[in-house]
């Protein structure tokens, strides 16, 4: 993936995540531009470019699927959940006060 594609994905993800919140959207755009401008003179074959592009793609994915904004409507808040918002099944919450075992019966340290 090229840096230009990662830049565009990140800008679109910010627009989806912060739609309707012009102050936050503008700040996100400025931060994205600043981050890419700082690296604009780095050669394309530099070994630091691939991890930077991967990081930009991860941030874009996180913004699209995990950021939800709430707006105050009277005494309540309304969440702006969009089609890309990740929706969990909350299985662990449904268990109540039960103990959840992760990784089996291994003992830790000297216990």
From Swiss-Prot:
Mitochondrion is among the record's keywords: yes
GO CC, one annotated term: mitochondrial matrix
GO biological process, one term: mitochondrial respiratory chain complex III assembly
Keywords assigned by UniProt, alphabetized: Chaperone, Mitochondrion, Transit peptide
Localization: Mitochondrion matrix
Family according to the record: Belongs to the complex I LYR family. MZM1 subfamily.
Physiological role: Assembly factor required for Rieske Fe-S protein RIP1 incorporation into the cytochrome b-c1 (CIII) complex. Functions as a chaperone, binding to this subunit within the mitochondrial matrix and stabilizing it prior to its translocation and insertion into the late CIII dimeric intermediate within the mitochondrial inner membrane. Modulates the mitochondrial matrix zinc pool.
The name this protein goes by in its record: Mitochondrial zinc maintenance protein 1, mitochondrial
Natural source organism: Neurospora crassa (strain ATCC 24698 / 74-OR23-1A / CBS 708.71 / DSM 1257 / FGSC 987)
């Amino acid at each position: 993936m090229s840096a230009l594609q990662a830049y565009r994905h990140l800008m679109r993800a910010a627009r989806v995540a912060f739609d309707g919140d012009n102050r936050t959207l503008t700040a996100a755009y400025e931060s994205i531009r600043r981050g890419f401008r700082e690296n604009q003179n780095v050669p394309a074959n530099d070994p630091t470019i691939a991890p930077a592009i991967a990081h930009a793609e991860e941030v874009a994915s996180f913004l699209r699927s995990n950021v939800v904004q709430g707006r105050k409507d009277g005494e309540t808040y309304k969440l702006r959940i969009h089609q890309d918002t990740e929706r969990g099944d909350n299985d662990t919450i449904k268990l109540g006060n039960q103990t959840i075992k992760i990784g089996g019966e291994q003992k830790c340290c000297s216990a």
